[in-house]
Curated annotation (Swiss-Prot):
Family to which this protein belongs: Belongs to the transcriptional antiterminator BglG family. GlcT subfamily.
Encoding gene, per UniProt annotation: glcT
Presence of keyword Repeat: yes
Residues of the PRD domain: 65-173, 174-281
UniProt keywords, alphabetically: Repeat
Highest taxon in the source lineage: Bacteria
GO MF: RNA binding
An annotated GO BP: positive regulation of DNA-templated transcription
Protein name: Protein GlcT
Organism: Staphylococcus saprophyticus subsp. saprophyticus (strain ATCC 15305 / DSM 20229 / NCIMB 8711 / NCTC 7292 / S-41)
Listed NCBIfam families: antiterm_GlcT (NF047357)
Database matches in Pfam families: CAT_RBD, PRD
Length: 281
């Protein structure tokens, strides 16, 4: 670290340095305190964790974000990132520090202006990404403490999705699409079965996980082994369940623009059947 030359101190937590004629943005709690341009960053300086941005596009975006936030907010964001990177989750530190800084700065500004955004996927996020959700709870707890605010539970879900999108190599847009397709599938279920699905049940957790992994299989071009005899049996004995499963499959095929293999209908029919039977009992 001792060969980093400080060229600019953005704030107490962010500095711009050069090393071997290349520019870097260094981010860490208190890294800029009492620092000035022209100083060398000492290797033995006690710093909890440093995040280094070496790509110009990332640096430019991060510098722009720094103009929108004060030291306290940036420190809170860094502490939030530290909570995630110190957890068992394997994340891309550079990608995470950029996306989370962007999200938290604007979430904080919306909160101060009382412009809250409802999270329609809070239940699904909590079910699908339980580990990420628990970490997000700690993040929000820390943000609330440092910033002296109270983020709503919806924000826990948003943070959890940021963590999950980083660990699963999916963009936020792709994760939103998966949640949207799950919601549309549940709507088809409730509408055709004429019942309200209890989202706190194990059956619901299994269903949304099935849809989640089904979408992943489709995107990866994977298919399940087809059993014609079993398919014919389900179609004959449980026509309503089979048709609901078929309708959901057509939805996925249309939205994802990917071929859905017939074998998938069999396994989805079984899930629909369990919902129908549990409702009867």
């Amino acid at each position: 670290m001792n060969d980093f030359l400080i060229t600019k101190v953005l704030n107490n937590n962010v500095i711009i340095c050069t090393k071997a004629q290349a520019e870097y943005v260094l981010i860490a709690k208190g890294i800029g305190f009492n620092k000035k341009s022209g100083m060398i960053l000492q290797e033995n300086q006690t710093i909890e964790k440093i995040y280094i941005l070496d790509q110009k596009s990332q640096q430019d975006h991060y510098k722009t974000l720094m103009e929108l936030a004060n030291d306290t907010l940036i420190q809170a964001v860094i502490e939030a990132v530290n909570i995630i990177t110190n957890s068992e989750m394997k994340v891309d530190n550079q990608k995470l520090v950029i996306s989370l800084t962007d999200h938290i700065i604007f979430a904080y500004k919306r909160l101060k202006q009382n412009q809250l955004i409802n999270n329609p996927f809070i239940v699904e996020t909590k079910q699908l990404y339980s580990k990420e959700y628990k970490i997000a709870e700690k993040v929000i707890e820390r943000l609330n403490h440092v910033l002296e605010v109270h983020f709503p539970e919806d924000e826990i879900g948003f943070i959890a999705l940021h963590i999950a999108s980083n660990t699963e190599s999916l963009s936020m847009r792709e994760m939103d699409l998966i949640n949207e397709l799950i919601n549309k599938s549940v709507f088809i279920l409730e509408n055709d079965l004429k019942q309200t699905i209890d989202k706190d049940t194990i059956q619901y957790q299994r269903f949304i996980r099935h849809i989640q992994f089904l979408i992943k299989r489709l995107r990866n071009g994977e298919s399940l082994k087809k059993t014609n005899a079993f398919e014919a049996l389900l179609k004959e004995q449980y026509p309503l369940c089979f048709n609901i499963a078929l309708k959901i499959m057509r939805l996925l095929q249309q939205e994802l623009k990917i071929k859905v293999y017939e074998a998938e209908v069999i396994y989805l029919t079984l899930h629909v059947y369990h919902f129908m039977e549990n409702h009867k009992s």
